[in-house]
UniProtKB/Swiss-Prot annotation:
Record key words, sorted: Ribonucleoprotein, Ribosomal protein, RNA-binding, rRNA-binding
Protein's recorded name: Small ribosomal subunit protein uS8
Any one GO BP annotation for this protein: translation
Quaternary structure (record): Part of the 30S ribosomal subunit. Contacts proteins S5 and S12.
Residue ranges crossing the lipid bilayer per the database entry: none
Superkingdom classification of source: Bacteria
Assigned GO CC terms: ribonucleoprotein complex; ribosome
SUPFAM superfamilies the UniProt entry points to: Ribosomal protein S8
Function: One of the primary rRNA binding proteins, it binds directly to 16S rRNA central domain where it helps coordinate assembly of the platform of the 30S subunit.
A GO molecular-function descriptor: structural constituent of ribosome
Family membership noted in the UniProt record: Belongs to the universal ribosomal protein uS8 family.
Pfam family, one: Ribosomal_S8
Organism: Campylobacter lari (strain RM2100 / D67 / ATCC BAA-1060)
Length: 131
């Protein structure tokens, strides 16, 4: 049984990128789907789609690589964990890696990237960072 679905999903994406796999399969949840929507909008993955097999939902993720075949994801890291929650205010999530990275935040307005959360004027639980 998986206790932390977000950590498991990020690890699967990281491992698939290191092995240069074209796709990887994740367990489905609404938070993971929102997280992947941000990754796709920011250009870290090509696409994703939800599939249902035997009444279970999965997400197929198509990874993105540069012209040299290297994954465009340099590092993806889980920040807030089940044993230690990390919360940041709107002023603390303004920029990450001088604008080259993204902080994904779970807010009262949904799961948002750091620039969207700053514009909306909300803070929240920091789910992960990616660059």
């Amino acid at each position: 049984m998986i206790n932390d679905l977000i950590s498991d999903s990020l690890t699967r994406i990281r491992n698939a990128g290191m092995r240069r796999l074209e796709t990887t399969q994740l367990l489905h949840s609404k938070v993971i789907e929102a997280l992947l929507g941000i990754f796709q909008a920011k250009g870290y993955i090509e696409s994703f789609n939800v599939i249902e097999e035997n009444k279970k939902k999965f997400i197929n993720v198509v990874l993105k690589y540069d012209e040299k075949g290297k994954s465009v994801i340099n590092e993806v890291k889980r920040v807030s964990k089940p044993g230690r929650r990390v919360y940041k205010g709107k002023d603390e999530i303004k920029r990450f890696k001088n604008g080259y990275g993204t902080i994904v935040v779970s807010t009262s307005k949904g799961v948002l990237a750091n620039d969207e959360a700053y514009k909306a004027g909300v803070g929240g639980e920091v789910l992960c960072t990616i660059w």
